[in-house]
């Protein structure tokens, strides 16, 4: 079992051991007057840090593979940390990709129809989404789709690397960590 896990781990690490480049989201600064440019710039910098950390961890993993990874605490610690940094990078990309739109969800779209079918109305879904977002603590609220059961679900995810619903596809992501709002909106 241990040999299988090690060989599988090496295979997966090789798949992800490419350099990631932070996406440029500066176009959002002028598209979103309700969020101060300074807040967005700080948030973009934080996101860039996640991208840098993922690349750094990939390099460290490559270096560790030259040693005895089966008993390496360093290798195992890097693997644990990887989920935090990688998921932080991906969740920020999903969040920023959601921002800047000025159009309402098309009532004829499949997503809109699914929301109404499952929640009873679009307003009911918004109410549920906002109630989920008001969960005390830091984290993310994610509208997710379970393709297996064809269900939508508003989920609260506290940490980047704990709590994701792995069979769900994220459709809408909102960052509710303090860095996303506190300097502009305080605790309101």
What does each model-identified segment do?
Residues 17-188:
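Feature for soluble, non-membrane regions of globular proteins
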Residues 4-13:
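Sec-dependent N-terminal signal peptides
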């Amino acid at each position: 079992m241990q040999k299988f896990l090690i060989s599988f781990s090496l295979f997966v690490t090789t798949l992800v051991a490419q350099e990631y480049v932070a996406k440029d989201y500066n176009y959002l600064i002028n598209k979103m007057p309700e969020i101060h440019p300074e807040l967005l710039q700080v948030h973009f910098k934080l996101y860039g840090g996640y991208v840098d950390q993922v690349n750094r961890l990939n390099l460290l993993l490559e270096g560790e593979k030259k040693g005895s990874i089966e008993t390496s605490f360093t290798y195992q610690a890097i693997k644990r940390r990887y989920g935090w940094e990688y998921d932080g990078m991906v969740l920020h990309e999903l969040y920023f990709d959601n921002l800047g739109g000025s159009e309402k969800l098309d009532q004829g779209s499949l997503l809109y129809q699914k929301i109404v079918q499952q929640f009873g109305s679009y307003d009911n879904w918004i109410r549920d989404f906002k109630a989920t977002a008001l969960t005390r603590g830091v984290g993310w609220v994610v509208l997710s789709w379970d393709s297996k059961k064809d269900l939508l679900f508003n989920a609260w995810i506290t940490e980047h690397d704990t709590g994701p619903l792995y069979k769900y596809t994220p459709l809408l992501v909102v960052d509710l960590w303090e860095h996303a709002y506190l300097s502009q909106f305080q605790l309101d």
